[in-house]
């Protein structure tokens, strides 16, 4: 009997193949109390397991396969850091000594406490890091229980094997890569998990968050994985196999055709040129940027330098990362966003408490509250501007006061470089994110003070509609086509165009081809998105006739019902 599971698509593609279930360590461990004279032996067993796990991880790092993304090292470093954390080792040792319990139980109790703390974080990225804690503890438990430190697998050469697991760590995923599996499915995970990041970097179709895949799928079951929609069909009917066989062929043909658009200029049928830039997370994403045909980087998120570490990056480390990207783009524009971190993401000396980080001390607010931290980044960014076409983008601005303080901070950073005799581009452009409704409604202030604007639709929609899209109870209310959102977008894009200030959209709307003609109709001429989305958006632009869409756009902007707007947009896209 056929069964369909719904999950989260994190890496696209269509695969038809057979299931291979990966065994995993159960975290339901036994609890027993031992005589006092055996505690010393138990501590030695625990220490030995920690050291063996450390050696396994260090070995993976030093022997990183050539196909592994460079950020794989950062993931392994994070797992090594978790392994060395006092909450894992020291607290577990204390529990063994004080309660005379077995090592497995002590470790499991400490893990549960850490996971509970991570669950309290508002920020979805930080909340997802609980998965890394669980993966490290699983690895230690395997050592304690005498299981292999890797996921065993045996596959037939050239077979279409689909891995099904409760969860897979980035290190296990890299180790399994040589087996040439066709897709991966997991019960746990999210679009921002480290496993998802590695899967995308390896171009492996992947669906996570399936919840009961391990329960529902049996060894060697025939599966259809639709990585575009996050669907998994177990034991599909002949009709489904036939349908997806055709869809798979169409998908592969489409990818081939899209690659041919790499060198084609993005221009509408009526001759309007459009800039397509890429969003990146790491310097190592440059290869994907070049492959996509992007004409610049519209958003380089600098947070990767600050997360998952005890010591903040110094100026030199930041400078090297920014310069690498600037030089790698060969003179094309590179827009680097100053760190958009919440107060709950900081290391050591910048830790602060926030009951709701999304609305608290984050992004530019944190930068202005930590001037030394901000000055270090600004100096690194300015130094990098000497090596390429670097622009500095400031997130979460909401008032003239914040703009003035930011520009003053940049002026001070420039003066310090002048005093040190260090070269930089004195005319570097400074831009602001429009992601807070207050910024959109006081647009004139931004236009007068800044060189360019970038609309962050993800946060703008959340803040305007008062929706936390990570909250399952209200996520369905997150609507990019809400009339209020369209009015704000029209106001910002139109106002910037009238003033001659460059404006782009760098949120998810920019990378969704379903919204491309809508944004073009609002006057947008610069999009920034994940590199993999760029060919799809470019294809839509190439088939768009702007004068033909003028009348439907007027109707859309006069409509106050989201469902009706969606109908009108469907008609615009079908034209």
Spans of features found by a protein language model:
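Conserved alpha/beta-domain cores
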Residues: 254-575
């Amino acid at each position: 009997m056929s069964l369909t599971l719904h999950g989260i698509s994190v890496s696209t593609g269509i695969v038809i193949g057979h299931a291979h279930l990966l065994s995993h360590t159960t975290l339901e461990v036994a609890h027993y109390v031992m005589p006092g004279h055996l505690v010393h032996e138990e501590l030695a067993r625990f220490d030995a397991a920690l050291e063996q796990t450390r050696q396994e991880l260090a070995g993976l790092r030093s022997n990183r396969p050539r196909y592994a993304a460079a950020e794989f090292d950062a993931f392994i470093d994070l797992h090594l850091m978790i392994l060395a954390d006092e909450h894992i080792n020291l607290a577990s040792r204390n529990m063994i000594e004080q309660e005379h319990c077995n090592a497995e139980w002590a470790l499991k109790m400490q893990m549960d406490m850490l996971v509970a703390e991570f669950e309290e974080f508002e920020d979805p990225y930080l909340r997802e890091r609980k998965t890394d804690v669980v993966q490290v503890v699983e690895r230690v438990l395997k050592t304690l229980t005498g299981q292999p430190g890797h996921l065993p697998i045996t596959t037939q050469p050239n077979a279409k094997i689909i891995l099904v697991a409760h969860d897979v760590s980035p290190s296990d995923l890299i180790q399994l890569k040589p087996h040439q599996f066709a897709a991966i499915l997991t019960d746990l995970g999210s679009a921002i998990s480290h496993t998802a990041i590695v899967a995308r970097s390896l171009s492996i179709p992947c669906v996570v968050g399936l919840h009961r895949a391990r329960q529902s799928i049996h060894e060697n079951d025939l599966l259809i994985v639709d990585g575009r929609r996050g669907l998994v069909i177990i034991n599909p009917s002949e009709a489904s196999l036939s349908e997806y066989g055709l869809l798979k062929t169409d998908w592969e043909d489409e990818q081939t055709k899209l690659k041919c658009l790499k060198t084609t200029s993005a221009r509408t049928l009526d001759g309007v040129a459009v800039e397509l830039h890429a969003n990146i997370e790491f310097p190592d994403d440059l290869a994907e940027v070049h492959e996509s045909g992007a004409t610049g980087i519209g958003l380089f998120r600098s947070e990767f330098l600050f997360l998952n570490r005890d010591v903040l990056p110094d100026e030199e480390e930041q400078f090297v990362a920014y310069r690498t990207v600037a030089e790698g783009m060969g003179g094309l524009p590179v827009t680097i966003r100053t760190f958009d971190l919440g107060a709950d993401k900081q290391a050591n000396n910048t830790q602060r408490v926030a009951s709701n980080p999304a609305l608290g001390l984050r992004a530019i607010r944190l930068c202005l509250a930590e001037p030394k931290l901000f000055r270090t980044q600004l100096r690194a960014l300015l130094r990098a501007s000497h090596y390429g076409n670097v622009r500095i983008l400031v997130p979460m601005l909401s008032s003239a006061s914040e703009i003035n303080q930011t520009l003053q901070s940049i002026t001070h950073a420039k003066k310090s470089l002048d005093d040190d005799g260090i070269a930089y581009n004195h005319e570097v452009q400074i831009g602001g994110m429009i992601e807070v409704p207050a910024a959109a409604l006081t647009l004139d202030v931004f236009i007068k003070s800044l060189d360019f604007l970038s609309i962050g639709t993800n946060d703008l929609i959340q803040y305007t509609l008062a929706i936390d899209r990570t909250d399952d109870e209200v996520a369905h209310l997150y609507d990019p086509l809400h009339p209020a959102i369209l009015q704000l977008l029209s106001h910002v894009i139109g106002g910037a165009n009238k003033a001659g200030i460059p404006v782009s959209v760098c949120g998810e709307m920019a990378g969704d081809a379903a919204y491309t003609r809508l944004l073009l109709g609002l006057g947008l001429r610069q999009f920034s998105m994940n590199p993999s989305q760029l060919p799809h958006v470019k294809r839509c632009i190439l088939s768009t006739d702007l004068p033909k869409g003028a009348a439907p756009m007027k109707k859309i902007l006069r409509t106050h019902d989201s469902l009706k707007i969606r109908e009108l947009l469907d008609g615009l896209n079908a034209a």
